[in-house]
């Protein structure tokens, strides 16, 4: 089945998003992929607010992980791919969220994305 698609507007730039809203698609995430485009991302949609930890299992490139409550940023972290000999570290957000956005590493700093910022998301 083809992945669900959406878009987000951040700092007047539009990002093409793959929407991950099932347990299977959330577990897979971006694992095994070789790269992520500069204006591409993945949006993880959860059914309820929670403290959703993220890790970089089988992820080959660094990512900015942005936790959202509604469309408001509540936490941001840049995670690196694990080395071959290490188990990937898990980052637990500081606040409850209902969505998580993954973008190319460095985008959060480049766009000034920080706690309290707004992101316009697909419905």
What annotation goes with each model-predicted range?
Residues 1-123:
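Compact, glycine-rich, soluble single-domain proteins
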